[in-house]
Every structure is written in structure tokens, then in C-alpha cells.
């Protein structure tokens, strides 16, 4: 599924309770997005009969399932590196990253 069509569908649903493919296509074209009719048809068939709130809830449930299943794998991979003495390299990288983040302010100082 393409997120651009889902975003256009969500935007169109603010105006109509059940927007159609033509509504989604009109929004995409207004934004300068090229519409692939096959992909749009697939998305519209996949979300038929569901509200935007239902789609968001289903997506959030799927994302939390992915995050939970991926977290232990990342933790297991980091443990051998720390045991092998690889902890010094991330500390140096963190210091450099913090230094780069300070430069991102670009002199605006809005919250200083």
C-alpha cells in the first residue's frame, strides 16, 4: 500500500464520509503527485468499508507488534559488542552527534 494514497484518502474523508478513488486522485494531482491507477485501485479495495479511525487503529496495532518483535533482536545483537569492549566507540560517536546537533540551531535561538 502506498502512504500517499492513504494520506489523500484521510484528507478527502474530512469532506466526505466515504471518499472514492476520484476524490483521492484529485487530491494527489492537486499536490503534483503522479497517480498509478493500479496502486490506487488496490488501496481503495483494501480500505473499502473502513473509516479512517479504524485504519489508524489497525495500523497502530500492527506497528506496535512490529516494534515489540524487533526490540529483542536489537538488544541481543548489542550484548556481544559490549562484552567485546565495543562500548568506547559508541561513546565517541555520541559526543560527535551532540556536537552536530548544536550546529543545527542555525542561529535562530527561538527557545534560548
Curated annotation (Swiss-Prot):
Similarity comment: family membership: Belongs to the eukaryotic ribosomal protein P1/P2 family.
GO cellular component: cytosolic large ribosomal subunit
Name assigned to this protein: Large ribosomal subunit protein P2-B
Pfam families: Ribosomal_60s
Role this protein plays: Plays an important role in the elongation step of protein synthesis.
Oligomeric form and interacting partners: P1 and P2 exist as dimers at the large ribosomal subunit.
A GO MF label: structural constituent of ribosome
Any one of the GO BP annotations: cytoplasmic translational elongation
Positions of the UniProt region annotated as Disordered: 89-112
Keyword Ion transport (UniProt): no
UniProt cross-references to InterPro entries, sorted A to Z: P1/P2_N_sf (IPR038716), Ribosomal_P1/P2 (IPR027534), Ribosomal_P1/P2_euk (IPR001859), Ribosomal_P2 (IPR044076)
Signal peptide: none
Keyword hit for Repeat: no
Post-translational modification summary for this protein: Phosphorylated.
Organism listed in the record: Trypanosoma cruzi
Keyword tags: Phosphoprotein, Ribonucleoprotein, Ribosomal protein
